[in-house]
Every structure is written in C-alpha cells, then in structure tokens.
Design a protein with these regions (language model features):
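PLP-dependent aminotransferase-like
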Residues: 4-90
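Positions that flank functional sites
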Residues: 18, 43, 94, 120, ...
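Histidine-centered beta-alpha loop that forms part of the nucleotide-sugar donor binding/catalytic region
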Residues: 19, 33, 40, 64, ...
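A short alpha/beta connector and helix-capping loop motif
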Residues: 45-52, 101-111, 287, 292-294
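PLP-dependent aminotransferase class I/II
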Residues: 59-63, 68, 72-74, 93, ...
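Hydrophobic faces of well-ordered beta-strands that scaffold small-molecule active sites
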Residues: 86-88, 111, 240, 274
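Conserved active-site segment immediately N-terminal to the catalytic lysine
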Residues: 88-123, 152-155
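Active-site PLP attachment segment
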Residues: 106-144, 167
Length: 295
C-alpha cells in the first residue's frame, strides 16, 4: 500500500537493502516496480555509499533493521537532495529513535510498522502505514477498502483489495499500545542484563545506542561457526535466529543486484539474534549467557 501511494510510473527503480525480510522487496514487485538491491554497513542498515553506486532510483525503502538507526540523517538528506521518495520499513523499530531523536517511522514520506506476533506489540497479524501527506492518506483510506469512492457507496475508483483491520484486531492494538512503555522498559532490562552477563572471546555483543531499542539482542561471531553455535544452543533448548538471508541469495531475486554486496553477505554469516521476548526473565538470560559463554 505504501509503495502504491507514491503513484510512480510502472517499472520505476526502487532501492532496497540486501538485509531485510522479503516482504520489503515483494512490496516493490507487487506494485509493478523494479527493485535495486544495495549493500549494508556494519550496523546492518543500508549503505549510503552503495546506494550512490546503484542505478538512479525514484524511491528508497529504508529499513532500521532490528531497531538499529543506521545513518538515517544522511540518508534522509540524500533523498531530499536527489528528490528520492523515502519509505521506512520500520517493522522492527517501534520504540527506537534515530540519531536526531526522531522516532523511527517519522522521517519518511510513508512508514510501515508491523504488528505480527513476535513484534514489540501485536495484533496477531497486520500493521499500519504512517504518513503526514494528505494525498497519500486519502489514497490509503480508499485503497484499503477495495478503492471504494469517498461516499462509501458501491462505486470504486479502480482496482483495490481488502486491507482493513478487523474490529477485534483494532481493540487488541489499542490495548497493546497502552502497554508500549512497559514493553520498552522490559526490552531495556533484557538488553542491560545481557550486557552484564555475556562475555566471550568468540563473539561480541552488539551494542545499541541510548536512543535505539533492540528487537533482538545480537551477537557477532569472530569466525564463521554460526551453524555450529546454533546447533549447540539448540541442544541446550535455546532457540536463536540468524539474520534474514541476503535478498540476492533468493533465486527469484538474484537479477536485481548490480553493486557489490559483500558486507551484507559477511554479516549474514556472523550475526545471530538471541532470545529477547519481553517475558524473558533474568534467570533465563543467566542460563542463555552462561551457555553462550561456555561455547
């Protein structure tokens, strides 16, 4: 919906970072445009240098992956200078802020937040689109309901689908939002306890800035034994997640990259997401950390 709102000419080029869930790039394809995959920096967010080397794009999907803010201010300024539409895929980033202390999801022409079950707040499935542009807003209101005319009759402006929330989901969402500050506090508690208990010469705990909120606490291995570590932790009943596979490694997306993406590929082989549910207790973190420290 956010990509459709831009009303770009079909086949327009839209940049997307190599490290993101396929939903980000699928939105570009579904809207009839051409993705341009670019590399990421060490913080796992989109690389401005890589973007500058890519084909000229009409829009950019910026992803503050795992709550990391990246070089968002420079990206925003570059998009403004080059007249590139900016969409934020802030699925992971509710509760995080950018270096200018603006909330993730507040600097783009449009922004998207996810409410799937494992996000900081949930409505079961779905999400929301944010914008302060009245044209985009009015389009979104129509397109979410079969592109129905403004008088809500059974006449339609054109093609549209049903993207509406159910009343039940909305009720759950309102309740979840009322608990957001508590969820943020729990995320910070978990982050602090990992910082106090993890210590190993085989990996580093990724540090988050004060204005950033981790979706998952993350370690960076000093070698490429990530599969061995995942299997070891699994044998101890500790579930972990690797990063999303780089987009260019998906067979149906391999043709959408024409810049070097070495950094994102190396990151995929070294970074691991740790258990970070808001219900995780300090005792459970102690067990996870001691197990990791013994690896």
């Amino acid at each position: 919906m956010a990509v459709l709102s831009l009303n770009l000419k079909k086949g327009s080029l839209i940049a997307v970072p190599n490290l993101t869930m396929v939903a980000t790039i699928n939105a570009i394809l579904w809207a009839g445009h051409v993705p341009v995959i670019v590399d990421t920096d060490d913080d796992l967010c989109l690389s401005l240098d890589s973007l500058k080397k890519a084909d000229k794009v009409s829009a950019l999907m910026y992803v503050p992956l795992n709550g990391k803010s990246g070089n968002s201010v420079e990206i925003k300024n570059y998009c403004t200078e080059k007249q590139i539409h900016l969409i934020e895929d802030s699925a992971h980033a509710l509760g995080s802020k950018y270096e200018n202390l603006k909330n993730c999801g507040s600097i783009g022409d449009l922004s998207v937040i996810s409410f799937t079950p494992h996000k900081i707040i949930t409505t079961g499935q779905g999400g929301m689109v944010l914008t302060n542009n009245s044209d985009y807003y009015n389009f979104l209101i129509q397109i979410k309901s079969f592109n129905r005319t403004k008088d809500k009759s059974d006449f339609h402006e054109g093609f549209g689908l049903n993207f509406k929330f159910t009343d039940l989901q909305a009720t759950i969402g309102v309740s979840q939002f009322s608990k957001l500050e508590n969820f943020i506090d729990q995320k910070k508690r978990i982050q602090k306890h990992y910082n106090e208990t993890l210590s190993s010469n085989k990996f580093d705990l990724v540090q988050f800035l004060d204005h950033e909120l981790p979706w998952f606490n993350t370690i960076r291995l000093k070698d490429n034994n990530i599969d061995k570590l995942v299997n070891f932790l699994s044998s101890k009943n500790i579930e972990t997640r690797t990063l999303y596979p780089p987009l260019h490694t998906q067979k149906y997306l391999a043709d959408y990259v024409n810049v070097d993406v070495t950094s994102s590929l190396e990151s995929f082989e070294k970074y691991l997401w740790l258990p970070s549910s808001t219900k995780l207790t300090n005792e459970e973190i102690d067990y996870i950390s001691s197990t990791l420290n013994s690896f």
